[in-house]
Amino acid sequence: GAAAIQNIGAYGMEIKDVIESVEAYNQLTFEKRTFTNSDCEYGYRNSYFKNEHHDPHIITYITLRLSKNPGFSVNYGNLKEELTKYPEVTLETIREAVITIRRQKLPDPEVLGNAGSFFMNPIITAEHFEKLKKQFPEIPSYPASEGKIKVPAGWLIEQCGFKGKNHGSVGVYEKQALVLVNLGDARGDEIALVAESIRTAVKDRFGIEPVSYTHLRAHET
């Protein structure tokens, strides 16, 4: 369900590229509905099911349309590098390479509590990026739609000194600054506080305010 809600993606591909339809149950009207791909209103890590529509819907089923002759998207730096270790590029070797990279960068949630990447990679105008490039020549980037530029949020956070640092029971993962980890007994408000301090620091330095993937909910007893 989360895949269809979030429009998950990595290395130049998103699940919206293969979703045919999504079935959802509305908890307010008690109705089931089948949404076409266009009904889902997919955008970058966004969909109809997020924001004001995220509460009523429970995703119960998705239908994917897969190609027998898929095209490969392997131009992202670390994926391209990892694939050089394989004799040929196939769907199987791409899968193995992606799994290897993710295991190196992301902690196991059964060992160290986390929700994966906490922040989205921001997409900014080319004009904004050129200004940043003059001030920070080493800033990495990837092309986005409509002539805009995607900047890795992990790099921005790392430049602000958060990577590998602990703030009480909340930590910024030492191998990937995008990931916030629960070091044992962190509460939601503590995680929110650390996330806000990261947002403020990045905005002050780069003029970019990172947006969270996650929805924090209050615990009710």
Language model segments and positions:
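Conserved small/polar residues in nucleotide/adenosyl-binding loops
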Residues: T214-T221
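Structural signature of FAD isoalloxazine-binding scaffolds in flavoprotein oxidoreductases
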Residues: N7-N37, E41-Y42, E52-L64
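C-terminal or internal capping secondary-structure element at the end of a domain, subdomain, or sheet
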Residues: G188-S212
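Oxyanion-binding "anion nests"
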Residues: P87-E130
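Residue-level signal for inorganic ion chemistry
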Residues: F30, I62, F119, I157, ...
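A conserved active-site cap/scaffold subdomain adjacent to cofactor or substrate pockets
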Residues: D55, I59-Y61, L66, F72-K80
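Amphipathic, heptad-repeat alpha-helical segments used for oligomerization and assembly
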Residues: G168-S197
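A C-terminal functional module that forms or caps the active site or interfaces directly
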Residues: I149-F162
